[in-house]
């Protein structure tokens, strides 16, 4: 009798273990599917800046190199405002463009973001989900027709402020970094090599340190542990110098860490920089 009970117990444990593995696998697959949809939407918008016209007037006497630097700075700032990854991307004014000392006009999309951000229901502060909420804002306000692709199970609401965000198979936020230079070390599609994979938005190569950056969309996976560097704001001009000197698209040295893993659990993250997940 004891042997029978022992065998039944072992079989029950094996069955429960198999069920748990199946549930975890299902959650991973659901997460990959959601990230794949988000990847297509975000990259479509991101790539559109390669041919995007910017409303700037180049004054007479400007050299071709200076013109290219002005346009590159304008495109980068436009991307920051229309594809925000953090709340100060929404609240900050357009930056002054090099050589001409004037900013871009605020794009209509930024004004929509600001109306929501500064409305009667602003996001909480501090906000650990800000990168996830920015991603939802970009998709829902910048590409509203794309929302039809998502089931309600892929969306959650922060009860503290009412803001929405996409969630993974574990019900945790899916995060977003527009530029993640620090993830090059574990990315299948972002080499971090300016010589062999330069910035495609810099057609005149006026920023020799700029390399091809691809938006990072990620989940913390099974661990759920916060393990990616996101704390550093981007600056196109160094505020620590006078006069402020230009920086690369990666910004100041500390910004270049954004997207880098900060714990070993990051190896289990699910993200769009792994080819099999795209």
Each language-model region and where it sits:
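N-terminal pilin/flagellin-like segments and related low-complexity appendage regions
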Residues: 32-278
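Aliphatic-rich helix starts adjacent to a transmembrane/signal segment
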Residues: 15-36
């Amino acid at each position: 009798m004891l042997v029978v009970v022992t065998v039944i117990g072992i079989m029950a444990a094996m069955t429960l273990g198999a069920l748990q593995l199946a549930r975890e696998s299902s959650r991973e697959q659901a997460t990959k599917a959601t990230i794949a949809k988000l990847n297509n939407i975000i990259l479509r918008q991101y790539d559109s800046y390669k041919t995007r016209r910017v409303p700037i007037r180049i004054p007479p006497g400007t050299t071709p190199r200076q013109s290219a630097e002005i346009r590159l700075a304008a495109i980068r700032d436009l991307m920051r405002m229309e594809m925000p990854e953090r709340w100060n991307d929404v609240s900050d004014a357009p930056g002054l463009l090099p050589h001409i000392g004037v900013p871009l006009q605020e794009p209509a999309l930024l004004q929509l973001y600001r109306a929501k951000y500064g409305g009667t229901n602003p996001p909480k502060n501090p906000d650990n989900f800000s990168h996830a909420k920015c991603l939802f804002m970009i998709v829902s306000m910048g590409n509203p027709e794309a929302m039809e692709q998502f089931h309600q199970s892929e969306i959650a609401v922060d009860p503290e402020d009412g803001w929405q965000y996409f969630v993974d198979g574990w019900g945790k936020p899916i995060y977003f970094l527009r530029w993640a230079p620090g993830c090059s070390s574990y990315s299948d599609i972002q080499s971090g090599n300016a010589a062999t994979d330069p910035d495609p938005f810099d057609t005149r190569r006026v920023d020799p340190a700029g390399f091809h950056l691809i938006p990072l969309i990620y989940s913390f996976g099974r661990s759920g542990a916060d393990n990616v560097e996101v704390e550093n704001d981007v600056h196109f001009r160094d505020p620590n110098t006078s006069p402020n000197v230009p920086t690369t698209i990666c910004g100041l040295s500390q910004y270049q860490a954004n997207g880098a893993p900060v714990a070993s659990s990051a190896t289990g993250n699910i993200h769009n920089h792994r080819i099999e997940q795209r």
